[in-house]
Amino acid sequence: LGQDPYHEPGQAMGLAFSVPAGVPLPPSLRNIFRELEDDTGVQPPRSGDLTAWAERGVLLLNPVLTVEGGKANSHADWGWQAVTDAILAALSALPQPIACVLWGAHAQKKAPLLQSGAPRLLLRAPHPSPLSSYRGFFGSRPFSQINAFLTAHGEPPIDWAL
């Protein structure tokens, strides 16, 4: 769970933190890939397209789904959070184990929506942006924690390689 889409033209593609192939990696995504490598040993991909993770069952969701070009969080009051809160509540009602990564204060406010139902893993860390990555994002090891949780509950681990 992130915050809102990338706000530069050509970056946002409907998946939190993902950018289309060929688009330079935003700093937050570079930091995610650095943590992925440090945590799991998976080599950082050249492309920032995270579609393969989505196809493997990873929901890459921003609570706010649109943004004005060049203005981060500019659509925070447009009502998107009612929609995405309903999505999170529906996920929480599912019977299977679910692991959630809440990156940044905006995402962490959504934790109460995710705590009911079957076993849940709620990982909280600072946002991967360069402004906060050294305050606990680096070293948070979310990828290995997710896989340990899933396998402990009889679910297959996620292949994080892209």
Set out the residue ranges of the language-model regions:
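A polyanion-binding, active-site-adjacent surface
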Residues: 1-124, 128-133, 139-161
